């Protein structure tokens, strides 16, 4: 892992965009994995800004979302396909049909999940995946206790995740779906590179477990320790419980002189 710790969320977004542009310059038709939630919002805004400035084109890009709720209407504002279109896809030149997400509405959810996993493989795999983290250490909707080798599957959302996400549903946990379709940890690990973003004190325990703890089902994001290309971008609050924070800062500074 390459770990950067910063005071400014705008700087985090800029650095994350820099990494994605590196991939774009090497491969203009790259495959982009997209996360939802609050963590990547500034990154997506920065990518839109750079598109408008002529620094990147999404004309040859295909995207694959990490996850989708089950049980929401297709046009629900908080549906993840709608989130991605609203915050990125509809604001750049990505062609119609190039943005993909898990199907949370099909009659056979498990078959749909397996088909999504195969679609990613058929498209050559994800070149760079954007990731955030839940307060319980989940990535995608891979909750604690699941297998570390899972593929895209139907999952059950924990009470903690539903409480965390209630802020997107007028604070009402009863409006938050109980199920989802999510890329599995094995699917996520197949991505060639990752950009991981975490901000805020509420993520500090999960960040510490992911980086400095053992690899365990209790903290699903810890599996990223086994991936060869993960760029971790944190603010001071999210990094506040890291015992080796000063070391990570020193290494980052020396590598980015």
What would you call each of these model-derived segments?
Residues 186, 190-257:
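ATP/nucleoside-binding phosphotransfer catalytic cores, i.e., glycine-rich phosphate-binding loops
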Residues 1-32:
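N-terminal glycine-/serine-/threonine-rich phosphate-binding loop
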Residues 26-52:
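Glycine-rich N-terminal segment of FAD-binding domains in flavoprotein oxidoreductases
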Residues 30, 38-39, 43, 119-144:
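A glycine-rich beta-strand to alpha-helix segment
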Residues 33-37, 65, 102-103, 130-133, ...:
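Short beta-strand segments
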Residues 136, 140-185:
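Class I SAM-dependent methyltransferase SAM-binding "motif I" and its flanking Rossmann-like core
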Residues 46-57, 80-82, 144-154:
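A glycine- and small-aliphatic-rich helix-loop capping segment at beta-alpha/alpha-beta transitions
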Residues 56-129, 246, 251-256:
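Ligand-binding beta-strand-loop-alpha-helix segment within the catalytic cores
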């Amino acid at each position: 892992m390459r770990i950067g710790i910063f005071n400014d969320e705008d700087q985090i977004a800029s650095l994350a965009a820099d990494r994605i542009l590196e991939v774009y310059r090497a491969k203009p038709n790259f495959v982009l994995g997209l996360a939802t939630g609050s963590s990547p919002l500034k990154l997506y805004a920065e990518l839109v800004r750079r598109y408008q400035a002529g620094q990147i084109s999404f004309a040859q890009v295909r995207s694959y979302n990490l996850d989708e709720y089950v049980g929401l209407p297709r046009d629900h504002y908080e549906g993840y396909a709608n989130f991605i279109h609203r915050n990125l896809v509809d604001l750049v030149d990505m062609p119609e049909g190039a943005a993909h997400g898990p199907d949370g509405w099909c009659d056979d959810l498990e078959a749909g999940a397996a088909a999504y996993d195969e679609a990613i493989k058929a498209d050559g795999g994800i070149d760079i995946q954007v990731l955030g983290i839940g307060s319980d250490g989940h990535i995608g909707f891979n909750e604690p206790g699941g297998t570390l080798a899972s593929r895209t599957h139907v999952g059950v959302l924990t009470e903690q995740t539903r409480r965390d996400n209630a802020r997107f549903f007028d604070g009402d946990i009863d409006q938050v779906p109980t199920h989802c379709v999510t890329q599995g940890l094995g699917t996520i690990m197949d991505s060639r590179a990752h950009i991981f973003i975490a901000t805020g004190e509420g993520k500090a325990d999960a960040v510490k477990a992911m980086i400095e703890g053992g690899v365990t089902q209790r903290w699903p994001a810890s599996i990223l320790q086994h991936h060869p290309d993960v760029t971790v971008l944190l603010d001071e609050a999210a990094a506040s419980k890291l015992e080796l924070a000063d070391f990570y800062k020193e290494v980052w500074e020396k590598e980015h002189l």
